Amino acid sequence: IPDMKIDNLMCTKRSFVEGRELEDNAFVIMNLKGSESVQAGAQVYCWASSINSGARHYHKIRVVGSKASLEWDDERPNQMLYEIEGEPSRVLERGAGYLTDEARVEDRIGGGHAEGLFEAWSNLYARFAVAMADADKGVYGDFWYPDVKAGAQGIKWIEKCVESADKGSAWVDYE
Protein backbone atom coordinates (compact mmCIF):
# COMPACT_ATOMS: atom_id res chain seq x y z
CA ILE A 1 0.00 0.00 0.00
CA PRO A 2 1.88 3.06 -1.24
CA ASP A 3 3.15 5.86 0.93
CA MET A 4 2.34 4.14 4.22
CA LYS A 5 4.75 5.13 7.00
CA ILE A 6 4.20 3.53 10.40
CA ASP A 7 4.53 5.69 13.51
CA ASN A 8 3.89 2.98 16.12
CA LEU A 9 2.12 -0.35 16.48
CA MET A 10 0.52 -2.70 18.96
CA CYS A 11 0.30 -6.48 18.53
CA THR A 12 -1.36 -9.31 20.35
CA LYS A 13 -0.62 -12.92 19.41
CA ARG A 14 -1.44 -16.37 20.77
CA SER A 15 -1.87 -20.03 19.94
CA PHE A 16 -5.33 -21.53 20.02
CA VAL A 17 -4.25 -24.97 18.86
CA GLU A 18 -2.51 -26.87 21.65
CA GLY A 19 1.04 -27.95 20.88
CA ARG A 20 1.75 -25.41 18.15
CA GLU A 21 5.25 -23.99 18.42
CA LEU A 22 4.27 -20.70 16.78
CA GLU A 23 1.24 -18.54 17.40
CA ASP A 24 -1.67 -19.18 15.07
CA ASN A 25 -3.53 -15.89 15.53
CA ALA A 26 -2.42 -12.25 15.73
CA PHE A 27 -3.93 -8.76 15.61
CA VAL A 28 -1.88 -5.65 14.83
CA ILE A 29 -2.96 -2.00 15.01
CA MET A 30 -0.68 0.54 13.35
CA ASN A 31 -0.84 4.34 13.64
CA LEU A 32 0.43 6.05 10.50
CA LYS A 33 2.50 9.15 10.01
CA GLY A 34 1.10 11.82 7.74
CA SER A 35 2.15 11.96 4.09
CA GLU A 36 0.95 13.29 0.77
CA SER A 37 -1.73 10.62 0.49
CA VAL A 38 -2.20 9.50 4.11
CA GLN A 39 -3.73 11.60 6.88
CA ALA A 40 -1.66 11.71 10.08
CA GLY A 41 -3.16 9.45 12.72
CA ALA A 42 -4.83 7.12 10.23
CA GLN A 43 -4.87 3.54 11.46
CA VAL A 44 -4.27 0.19 9.81
CA TYR A 45 -5.68 -3.02 11.29
CA CYS A 46 -4.14 -6.37 10.42
CA TRP A 47 -5.48 -9.78 11.39
CA ALA A 48 -3.42 -12.87 10.57
CA SER A 49 -4.86 -16.24 11.50
CA SER A 50 -4.56 -19.89 10.59
CA ILE A 51 -7.59 -20.81 12.70
CA ASN A 52 -10.31 -19.00 10.74
CA SER A 53 -12.66 -21.99 10.64
CA GLY A 54 -14.35 -22.57 7.31
CA ALA A 55 -12.15 -20.13 5.41
CA ARG A 56 -9.49 -21.16 2.97
CA HIS A 57 -6.17 -19.37 2.68
CA TYR A 58 -7.92 -16.03 2.48
CA HIS A 59 -6.13 -12.71 2.07
CA LYS A 60 -8.04 -9.44 2.06
CA ILE A 61 -6.92 -5.83 1.88
CA ARG A 62 -9.41 -3.07 2.70
CA VAL A 63 -8.45 0.60 2.51
CA VAL A 64 -10.95 2.96 4.14
CA GLY A 65 -10.64 6.65 3.34
CA SER A 66 -12.66 9.69 4.38
CA LYS A 67 -14.74 9.61 1.16
CA ALA A 68 -14.34 6.12 -0.31
CA SER A 69 -13.12 2.59 0.36
CA LEU A 70 -11.42 -0.12 -1.68
CA GLU A 71 -11.43 -3.85 -0.96
CA TRP A 72 -9.59 -6.70 -2.67
CA ASP A 73 -9.37 -10.36 -1.73
CA ASP A 74 -7.60 -13.32 -3.27
CA GLU A 75 -10.79 -15.36 -3.58
CA ARG A 76 -11.88 -12.89 -6.29
CA PRO A 77 -8.53 -11.66 -7.63
CA ASN A 78 -9.94 -10.09 -10.81
CA GLN A 79 -12.28 -7.76 -8.92
CA MET A 80 -11.97 -4.83 -6.55
CA LEU A 81 -14.88 -3.42 -4.57
CA TYR A 82 -15.05 0.39 -4.83
CA GLU A 83 -17.39 2.16 -2.41
CA ILE A 84 -17.93 5.93 -2.55
CA GLU A 85 -19.89 7.49 0.31
CA GLY A 86 -23.53 8.03 -0.69
CA GLU A 87 -23.25 5.98 -3.91
CA PRO A 88 -23.91 2.33 -4.73
CA SER A 89 -20.96 -0.05 -4.41
CA ARG A 90 -19.10 -0.78 -7.65
CA VAL A 91 -17.11 -3.82 -8.64
CA LEU A 92 -14.09 -2.91 -10.75
CA GLU A 93 -12.94 -5.68 -13.11
CA ARG A 94 -9.34 -6.36 -14.08
CA GLY A 95 -8.61 -5.47 -17.68
CA ALA A 96 -11.68 -3.25 -18.12
CA GLY A 97 -11.49 -0.24 -20.45
CA TYR A 98 -12.54 2.21 -17.73
CA LEU A 99 -9.34 1.57 -15.74
CA THR A 100 -6.29 3.83 -16.06
CA ASP A 101 -3.38 2.88 -18.29
CA GLU A 102 -1.32 2.32 -15.14
CA ALA A 103 -3.87 -0.21 -13.88
CA ARG A 104 -4.02 -2.05 -17.23
CA VAL A 105 -0.32 -2.07 -18.17
CA GLU A 106 0.45 -5.44 -16.58
CA ASP A 107 -2.75 -7.18 -17.65
CA ARG A 108 -1.29 -9.89 -19.88
CA ILE A 109 -4.27 -11.97 -20.93
CA GLY A 110 -7.28 -9.64 -20.88
CA GLY A 111 -10.36 -9.51 -18.71
CA GLY A 112 -12.37 -12.66 -18.12
CA HIS A 113 -9.32 -14.91 -17.85
CA ALA A 114 -7.78 -15.51 -14.44
CA GLU A 115 -4.16 -14.49 -14.06
CA GLY A 116 -1.93 -16.44 -11.76
CA LEU A 117 1.38 -16.74 -10.04
CA PHE A 118 3.34 -17.01 -13.29
CA GLU A 119 2.16 -13.58 -14.41
CA ALA A 120 2.77 -12.00 -11.00
CA TRP A 121 6.39 -13.22 -10.88
CA SER A 122 6.89 -12.26 -14.50
CA ASN A 123 5.74 -8.70 -13.78
CA LEU A 124 8.19 -8.41 -10.88
CA TYR A 125 11.09 -9.82 -12.92
CA ALA A 126 10.30 -7.46 -15.82
CA ARG A 127 10.35 -4.42 -13.51
CA PHE A 128 13.62 -5.57 -11.97
CA ALA A 129 15.18 -6.14 -15.43
CA VAL A 130 14.25 -2.60 -16.54
CA ALA A 131 15.77 -1.17 -13.35
CA MET A 132 18.99 -3.17 -13.88
CA ALA A 133 19.26 -2.10 -17.53
CA ASP A 134 18.81 1.55 -16.57
CA ALA A 135 21.34 1.22 -13.73
CA ASP A 136 23.88 -0.07 -16.28
CA LYS A 137 23.34 3.23 -18.13
CA GLY A 138 23.74 5.26 -14.93
CA VAL A 139 20.02 6.04 -14.74
CA TYR A 140 18.47 5.47 -11.34
CA GLY A 141 14.72 6.02 -11.61
CA ASP A 142 11.94 5.44 -9.18
CA PHE A 143 11.02 1.83 -9.99
CA TRP A 144 8.49 -0.22 -8.10
CA TYR A 145 9.60 -3.70 -7.18
CA PRO A 146 10.36 -5.39 -3.86
CA ASP A 147 14.01 -4.95 -3.04
CA VAL A 148 16.32 -5.59 -0.10
CA LYS A 149 14.88 -2.55 1.69
CA ALA A 150 11.36 -3.97 1.36
CA GLY A 151 12.57 -7.29 2.77
CA ALA A 152 14.32 -5.55 5.66
CA GLN A 153 11.16 -3.53 6.38
CA GLY A 154 9.16 -6.77 6.50
CA ILE A 155 11.57 -8.27 9.04
CA LYS A 156 11.52 -5.05 11.08
CA TRP A 157 7.70 -5.10 11.11
CA ILE A 158 7.66 -8.69 12.41
CA GLU A 159 10.28 -7.86 15.07
CA LYS A 160 8.25 -4.85 16.26
CA CYS A 161 5.09 -6.99 16.41
CA VAL A 162 6.89 -9.60 18.53
CA GLU A 163 8.34 -6.84 20.77
CA SER A 164 4.86 -5.39 21.34
CA ALA A 165 3.27 -8.77 22.06
CA ASP A 166 6.09 -9.76 24.42
CA LYS A 167 5.50 -6.50 26.34
CA GLY A 168 1.84 -7.38 26.93
CA SER A 169 0.55 -5.79 23.71
CA ALA A 170 2.18 -2.44 24.47
CA TRP A 171 2.46 0.30 21.85
CA VAL A 172 6.00 0.39 20.45
CA ASP A 173 7.59 3.07 18.28
CA TYR A 174 8.36 1.87 14.79
CA GLU A 175 11.56 3.87 14.25
Where are these regions (language model features)?
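Short glycine/proline- and acidic residue-enriched helix-loop micro-motifs
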Residues: 106-113
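Nucleotide-sugar-dependent glycosyltransferase catalytic core
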Residues: 90
